């Protein structure tokens, strides 16, 4: 007799768990896989040369003065990637790219209005990128300068151009980032350096 009384309770609990208002990973309003602060490297880099050998000119390698090729996601979710030099590339140019994708809630405020009461708020996804074509020096060494991107470098918008957009504190998420170095003459997608998350 007890088991027949529990069936309606179990059905009700199941219905509540499956409702649109139930808390689930897809209904929390933030990306499921955001990138945490930390240091990231190319998992496919050859430990001796520091790069993906198959995707670089024969004999290419990090110089002895170079530290590891790495990108650091800082606590403010900006990204800083290290400088390094690759010797043995001959006259082969390379294309370097650092791109990050973010989500945030943007609060639009009227200048002089109380910033705790935004006029309008909206969630947005945006990206910021830095890229360059690099040419090796006369000795066949490619110097790759430090690169960085920040979510605060990207201009945000509001429906009214007189309103001031501001990223709401605590709402910023780094969804993904990709740092890549591609040598001319190699197939698209074959990178000598590739650091990406997630």
Predicted ranges, named:
Residues 1-16:
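Sec-dependent bacterial lipoprotein signal peptides
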Residues 6-9, 25, 41:
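Serine/threonine-rich, low-complexity intrinsically disordered segments
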Residues 29-198:
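Mature extracytoplasmic or otherwise solvent-exposed domains
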Residues 15-36:
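Bacterial Sec-dependent N-terminal signal peptides
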């Amino acid at each position: 007799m007890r088991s027949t009384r529990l069936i309606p309770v179990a059905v009700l609990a199941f219905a509540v768990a499956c409702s649109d208002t139930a808390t689930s990973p897809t209904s929390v309003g933030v990306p499921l896989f955001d990138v945490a602060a930390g240091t990231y490297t190319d998992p496919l880099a050859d430990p001796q040369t520091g790069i993906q050998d198959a995707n670089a000119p024969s004999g290419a390698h990090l110089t002895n003065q170079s530290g590891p090729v790495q990108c650091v996601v800082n606590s403010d979710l900006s990204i800083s990637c290290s400088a390094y030099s690759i010797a043995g590339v001959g006259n082969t140019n390379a294309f370097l790219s650092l791109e990050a994708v973010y989500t945030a809630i943007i609060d639009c405020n009227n200048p002089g209005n109380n910033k705790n009461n935004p006029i309008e708020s909206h969630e947005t996804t945006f990206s910021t990128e830095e890229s360059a074509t690099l040419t090796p020096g006369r000795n066949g060494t490619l110097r790759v300068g430090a690169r960085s991107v920040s979510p605060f470098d990207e201009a945000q918008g509001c429906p009214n151009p007189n309103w001031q957009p501001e990223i709401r504190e605590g709402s910023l998420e780094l969804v993904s980032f990709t740092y890549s170095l591609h040598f001319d003459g190699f197939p698209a997608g074959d990178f000598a350096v590739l650091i990406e998350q997630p």
